[in-house]
Amino acid sequence: MKIAIISDIHGNLVALQSILSELKKADRVVCLGDVAAVGPQPHETIAFLRKARWPCILGNADETLANSKRESYAQIPEGDREKLVSLDEWTESEIDAADREFLSGFKPTIEVKGGKLSLLCYHGSPRSNTEQILPTTPEEELDRIFEGKNAQAYAGGHIHSQMVRKFGTSLIINPGSVGLPFFKASDGRAVNPVWAEYAVLTTSGDDLKVELRREKYSKRNLRDAVIESGMPDSEWWLRDWV
């Protein structure tokens, strides 16, 4: 059995479409949330996911959009904060009531079972879609996060960074971000690489194989989508894509 795991599309349908041929090879696809906000194609991405009928987790950005709330961006420098608020306002204007209803139907967690595989999916953690599970999260904190859980594998997004780490006899997996990945450049800046990140889990008997994948796509196609969308501060949004 082959399961593709995607997360954090963030309204970048160009990135999602670049991996679609690979996703179609999987027996199942699970989306870990944050599908529409902060990108150029929020409505189009939701429409695609509605048609795809993949099970989706409720990310923190999905919950905010579904309830017409706003992020505070309190930790963001003022100039960038104003641009993000403007982008959120634009995103709200781009989606409709049906889109919000669709987002509201996302689940906080999803259990996937197949053969001997038991997989628990969430956005941030099983207990909160804003909690971060990092490569450096202490084992004792993981014990609290996964208390009462007994899955062979756990999969979450939110941090926009790929990860596989052992936790007891289980694996904790983060597929990274399809539409808004980032890494620290040599000068310390956070930059967005033009690739789509995802994970593929393959089960055979008792064995579980995890592949963290990255697929490059066209920066020109992304730029064209951003300009065509009419999103505010488009050049600012594009400046860190490399």
Labelled PLM ranges:
Residues 1-4, 111-120, 167-171, 207-209:
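Beta-strand-turn-beta hairpins that frame and shape the catalytic cleft
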Residues 10, 36, 61-62, 125-127, ...:
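Catalytic metal-binding/acid-base residues of hydrolase active sites
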Residues 165-242:
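Acidic, His/Gly-rich catalytic cores of divalent-metal-dependent hydrolytic chemistry
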Residues 139-165, 170-175:
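Anionic-ligand binding region
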